[in-house]
């Protein structure tokens, strides 16, 4: 891991806040295992550092999306249980066994094909979680009969372990009857045969708002990092979450515009008066998109507007008159508030998307600085 970076743009990640959220979510669903979802580089926070910190504080089972993500965790010393939520190609099943990870069974056909690739001299077990499609329209078996047939095939093989069964809610973050309907289907099908070790259905929204008595594990993603899955969820709960990310940059240059001067590509901004502007070393290649033109960043407590188009690596802001703002002053792009102009919610609205996507867009060339001080670390992906 690198201990330096050479551009003053970075994402501060508060691991203690993530731990608090892990504990809050666990208290909402007592007697259930909390499975932290650390796919997509832990929603941009850094899966290795997040994984190690949560493991140190009791997490025993992580979820990722791909075999590559699971291998990354193993290569960095995370030896907990890991479930891959996405599809692993049948031909790669022995690689999954080698790294001791659990796989999702998306269909009977997948399982039947995967078995063909098992090494003949296999000595290690493979843990499997059967996915049931109760209304997401994505992965999963589509009937109780298919579920029973799939489990029977697993149990007919000496080294395949039926460890879990799960589904995924499509509208748990909305005021919709669909979640209850999905849960009832899931419960009915799961109850047709003896339960495996893990039964899980609740995502972040389901964990916060929905009781699922048949389940003994919850999968927490966005809320693990301190963000509500939707405004509806935030309105419906008293659970306090702690935002964990703060995106900071610095002013690298200041210049003065005359009346009529233009700024950035397309000359979309024209100075109507003499004004002072600052250049920031961050752009859409870092995950700060062009559509953020006209929104605000914070400098020394002042709201400053982004003028002209956001460039690949830089952007410009207008500075208020008579304010003592200089090269080297810190600029907040994203703060740890739940609302306000630099909140993740505000970013999502401005970008016409969801908070998940905003976090996942923050690029690999933005170093992550981990707090608190007792675990201080810097990860610069470009110097690994």
UniProtKB/Swiss-Prot annotation:
Gene: alr
This protein's record includes keyword Isomerase: yes
Pathway entry: Amino-acid biosynthesis; D-alanine biosynthesis; D-alanine from L-alanine: step 1/1
Cofactor requirements of the protein: pyridoxal 5'-phosphate
Positions of post-translational N6-(pyridoxal phosphate)lysine modification: 39
Function statement: Catalyzes the interconversion of L-alanine and D-alanine. May also act on other amino acids.
GO molecular function: alanine racemase activity; pyridoxal phosphate binding
Enzymatic reactions: L-alanine = D-alanine
HAMAP family xref list: Ala_racemase
Keyword check for Isomerase: yes
CC terms in the record's Gene Ontology section: cytosol
BP-aspect Gene Ontology terms: D-alanine biosynthetic process; peptidoglycan biosynthetic process
Name of the protein in question: Alanine racemase
Family under the similarity heading: Belongs to the alanine racemase family.
InterPro entries: Ala_racemase, Ala_racemase/Decarboxylase_C, Ala_racemase_C, Ala_racemase_N, PLP-binding_barrel
EC supergroup of this enzyme: isomerase
SUPFAM superfamilies in UniProt: Alanine racemase C-terminal domain-like (SSF50621), PLP-binding barrel (SSF51419)
NCBIfam families: alr (TIGR00492)
EC number annotated for this UniProt entry: 5.1.1.1
CDD domains assigned to the protein according to its UniProt record, in alphabetical order: PLPDE_III_AR
């Amino acid at each position: 891991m690198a201990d330096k970076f050479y551009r003053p743009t970075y994402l501060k990640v508060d691991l203690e806040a993530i731990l608090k959220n892990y504990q809050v979510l666990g208290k909402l669903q007592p007697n259930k295992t909390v499975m932290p979802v650390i796919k997509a580089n832990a929603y941009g926070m850094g899966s290795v550092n997040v994984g190690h910190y949560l493991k140190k504080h009791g997490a025993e089972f992580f979820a990722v999306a791909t075999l590559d993500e699971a291998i990354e965790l193993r290569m960095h010393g995370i030896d907990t249980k890991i479930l891959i939520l996405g599809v692993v190609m049948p031909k790669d099943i022995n690689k999954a066994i080698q790294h001791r990870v659990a796989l999702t069974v998306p269909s009977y056909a997948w399982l039947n094909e995967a078995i063909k690739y098992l090494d003949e001299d296999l000595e290690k077990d493979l843990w499997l979680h059967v996915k049931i499609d109760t209304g997401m329209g994505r992965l999963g078996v589509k009937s109780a009969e298919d579920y029973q047939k799939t489990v029977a095939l697993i149990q007919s093989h000496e080294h395949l372990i039926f460890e879990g069964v799960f589904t995924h809610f499509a509208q748990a973050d909305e005021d919709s009857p669909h979640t209850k309907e999905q849960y009832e289907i899931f419960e009915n099908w799961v109850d047709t045969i003896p339960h495996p070790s893990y039964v899980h259905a609740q995502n972040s929204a389901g964990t916060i708002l929905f009781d699922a008595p048949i389940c003994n594990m919850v999968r927490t993603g966005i809320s693990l990092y301190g963000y509500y899955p939707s405004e509806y969820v935030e309105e419906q709960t008293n659970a306090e979450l702690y935002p964990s990310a703060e995106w900071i940059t610095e002013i690298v240059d200041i210049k003065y515009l005359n009346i009529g001067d233009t700024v950035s590509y397309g000359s979309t901004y024209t100075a109507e008066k003499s004004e002072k502007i600052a250049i920031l070393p961050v752009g859409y290649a870092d995950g700060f998109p062009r559509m953020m033109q006209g929104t605000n960043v914070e400098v020394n407590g002042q709201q400053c507007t982004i003028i002209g188009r956001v460039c690949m690596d830089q952007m410009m802001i207008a500075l208020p008159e008579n304010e003592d703002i200089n090269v080297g002053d810190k600029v907040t792009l994203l703060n740890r508030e739940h609302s306000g102009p630099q909140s993740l919610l505000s970013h999502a609205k401005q970008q016409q998307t969801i908070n998940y996507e905003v976090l996942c867009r923050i690029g690999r060339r933005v170093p992550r600085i981990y707090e608190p001080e007792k675990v201080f670390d810097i990860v610069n992906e470009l110097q690994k």
